[in-house]
């Protein structure tokens, strides 16, 4: 597990972010070992590709944090953490990136381009590693639930079984994923849910924090990662302890308990999802706004609508007075007059 406070400690009082390690031998070695070994031919034999030695990647990346606060190093540290610690590792790694940006925006590497009006392109490019294929492939493989009957069920298999995405190679059925959740340890499920919530919160905070500093036009789109996290939470809503308790037919939980470890899991009723598009709470509102933002980023990037949508997100949890103050600053005094004195 990452010790985030230790990793965030300033390199020195005079130089909190240390040196730029872009051409440093240790950083180049980190990039090399993080790639693993590609498939290669030796004589007549074809040697299969080998994944990176993730413990070694994490150790070297953590060591480099003592010399530099660098988002490129943080990305490789995040990858190793996901590979080794799953969803907990993802949440911790995203928290590290979030705090790097929050505490060290002026000095974290890559630096803003001082010769081009503090252009953030290099920094944004480094942050896009959060939605690049190497990390997303690791997230797909994260065990979402561990069942005594089925073993670990990764995110890819769970999303396919829940009907949220389709993969021809995945065969787990809705009944089986329901059985896996019914068979899983309740404390482990609760910990997984907390990690998902934390990862989603940190991803949203990273996006909004960057947008506040550089503007939405030059901001960061973590849509692909947020979509996976949102869909993982949907699986929990459908099959997890709370969702399953509401959706299973009467007596189905008892049937599931009796069949722990048994093969015929089909007797467990598959949870019925909510009607598509139904909005039941503010969290659903925020998720729908995220979906709208993803559409505009992908299909109408020049549209001004995302600016309004992002502003709307900040108002979802505000009270009426806060909304008036945000939208019509000069109108708050009129609102106070209309409202009259508060009753004692």
Curated annotation (Swiss-Prot):
Q: A Pfam family in this protein?
A: ImpA_N
Domain of life, per UniProt, equals Bacteria
Instruction: Tell me the first and last residues of the signal peptide.
Output: none
Q: What happens when the gene is disrupted?
A: Deletion abolishes the secretion of Hcp1, Tse3 and VgrG proteins, all markers of T6SS activity.
Q: Got a GO cellular component term for this one?
A: type VI protein secretion system complex
The record's subunit annotation is: Homododecamer. Interacts with TssB1 and TssC1. Interacts with TssK1 and TssF1.
* General function of this protein: Core component of the H1 type VI (H1-T6SS) secretion system that plays a role in the release of toxins targeting both eukaryotic and prokaryotic species. Forms a dodecameric ring-shaped structure located at one end of the T6SS sheath. May properly attach the pre-assembled sheath onto the baseplate and/or stabilize the sheaths tubular structure.
Protein name, please? Type VI secretion system component TssA1
Q: Which organism is it from?
A: Pseudomonas aeruginosa (strain ATCC 15692 / DSM 22644 / CIP 104116 / JCM 14847 / LMG 12228 / 1C / PRS 101 / PAO1)
